[in-house]
Design a protein with these regions (language model features):
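Conserved substrate/cofactor phosphate-moiety recognition/catalytic segment
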Residues: 18-60
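ATP-dependent NMP and nucleoside kinases share a basic, alpha-helical "lid"
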Residues: 79-117
Length: 171
């Protein structure tokens, strides 16, 4: 099983993805670790990435599913804000990917981002991310979940939406 936990900064991607990987007995990866230094510096300076900046990174995210091997479920925390970004990830992956889209109100997102001290993404880029965000479309394999509830409840909702073990969905 290959899963991307997606959403804007502050939605809880890393926290939920880590808990989901633990619940499934799988591997957790954070797509932020796959950004190159130039992209990190650009975002830290408050400059939104362009599609050209994102393309190689999204390819690395898709390839990460393959390089994680056969370790069981692989869960990656990744913004994957637009449909075309998700399509780029799918194109590089060797198996179908389930997307768990996290949503939360802007005020709570901003509060969470402001409270972080160890992240390169400034609150100033939240509006840009919200403008860029495209919800999952009807033909995309996944689920949308609010992160207003506890991490345990959010993970439970995602697990409920996953297919039974051994079934494969195509996207």
């Amino acid at each position: 099983m290959r899963i991307v936990v997606m959403g804007v900064s502050g939605a809880g991607k890393s926290t939920v993805a880590l808990a989901l990987a633990a619940r499934l007995g799988g591997v957790y990866l954070d797509a932020d670790d796959l950004h190159d230094d130039a992209a990190r510096a650009k975002m830290a300076a408050g400059v939104p990435l362009t599609d050209e900046d994102r393309a190689p990174w999204l390819g690395r995210v898709g390839l990460a599913f393959t390089t994680a091997g056969e370790a069981g479920p692989v869960v990656i925390a990744c913004s994957a804000l637009r449909r075309r970004y998700r399509d780029l990830i799918r194109a590089e992956a060797t198996e179908p990917i389930f997307f768990a889209a996290l949503e939360l109100d802007e005020a709570t997102l901003a509060r969470r981002m402001a409270a972080r001290t160890d992240h390169f993404m400034p609150v100033a880029l939240l509006a840009s991310q919200l403008d860029t965000l495209e919800p999952l479309e009807a033909d995309e394999w996944g689920v949308t979940v609010s992160t207003r509830d506890s991490v345990t409840e959010v993970v439970a909702r995602i697990v409920e939406a996953l297919p039974a073990q051994g079934t494969i969905e195509s996207t």
